[in-house]
Amino acid sequence: MSGGAASAGFTVLIPARLASTRLPDKPLADIGGIPMVVRVAQQAARSRAARVVVAADHPRILEACAAHGVQAVATRADHPSGSDRLAEACVQLGLADDDVVVNVQGDEPLIAPALIDAVAALLPARPEADMGTAAHAIHAREDFANPNVVKVVLDARGLAHYFSRAPIPHARGHADTAWWQGGQAGVPAGCAPLRHIGIYSYRAAFVRAFAALPPAPTEALEALEQLRALWHGHRIAVHVADAAPGPGVDTPEDLERVRSLLG
């Protein structure tokens, strides 16, 4: 069976937390008359997922999902991270250890169904990997230098070697990003800068195991939860997408941009 076929029964989980510092009630932000988290679920439903479930921390999110026919489960409001919320949802849904789960962020209303499918397919195709995620080529030096743009370096097997907010890989003898002029020309094989895309796949057993792992020093330093997996010796397979995904929503300005794109 091919990796794509083997991933057809996966579950998409969308963690949704009502509180947001920069955009109050973000999951419920109106986009063309539809709450944002519902938009995300509708996009995910166009993938090959067997089911799409919102893991919500507030009754208002549950009510919004119910009003639009989206399955949702209530999770505790005091989870320290989205991964902890997913672990609780996996237990509530009774997922088997080997069931594939794709974590789609609740602020990605333009997430491409094909990207979800590709990340889900990583685990059946790469049984040595505990997680899957995605990245795309960086083409602008300002993105390479931006600490809000997370970079990932891969090894020869296409597994994540490290994630960082710093501009990696770094060329010795050059200041910051001066070695790289954008694009692929003149870049040694395997060294082209890649931007990490915040979507993950796991087997349900690993979701629960990950939530129980102690945080890693690098995770705290960089504020990147995925570094916990690497620190503890787990492998993360990476799908390199052909293009950047649609914009996510972190701020009111982001919301207006997405509203304009969706008409």
UniProtKB/Swiss-Prot annotation:
Please give the InterPro entries that the UniProt record associates with this protein: Cytidylyl_trans, KdsB, Nucleotide-diphossugar_trans
Biological processes annotated in GO = CMP-keto-3-deoxy-D-manno-octulosonic acid biosynthetic process; lipopolysaccharide biosynthetic process
Q: Main EC class of this protein?
A: transferase
Catalytic activity as recorded in UniProt: 3-deoxy-alpha-D-manno-oct-2-ulosonate + CTP = CMP-3-deoxy-beta-D-manno-octulosonate + diphosphate
Where found, per UniProt? Cytoplasm
Q: Does the keyword Manganese apply?
A: no
Q: What's in the keyword line of the UniProt record? A: Cytoplasm, Lipopolysaccharide biosynthesis, Nucleotidyltransferase, Transferase
**What pathway is this protein said to act in by its record?**
Nucleotide-sugar biosynthesis; CMP-3-deoxy-D-manno-octulosonate biosynthesis; CMP-3-deoxy-D-manno-octulosonate from 3-deoxy-D-manno-octulosonate and CTP: step 1/1; Bacterial outer membrane biogenesis; lipopolysaccharide biosynthesis
* Record-level GO cellular component terms: cytosol
Q: What is its EC number?
A: 2.7.7.38
Query: What Gene3D superfamilies does the annotation carry?
Result: Spore Coat Polysaccharide Biosynthesis Protein SpsA, Chain A
**Top-level taxon in the UniProt lineage:** Bacteria
Q: Which Pfam families match?
A: CTP_transf_3
Any idea what job this protein has? Activates KDO (a required 8-carbon sugar) for incorporation into bacterial lipopolysaccharide in Gram-negative bacteria.
State the family named in the UniProt similarity comment for this chain. Answer: Belongs to the KdsB family.
Q: What is this protein called?
A: 3-deoxy-manno-octulosonate cytidylyltransferase
Protein species of origin: Paracidovorax citrulli (strain AAC00-1)
Its encoding gene is what? kdsB
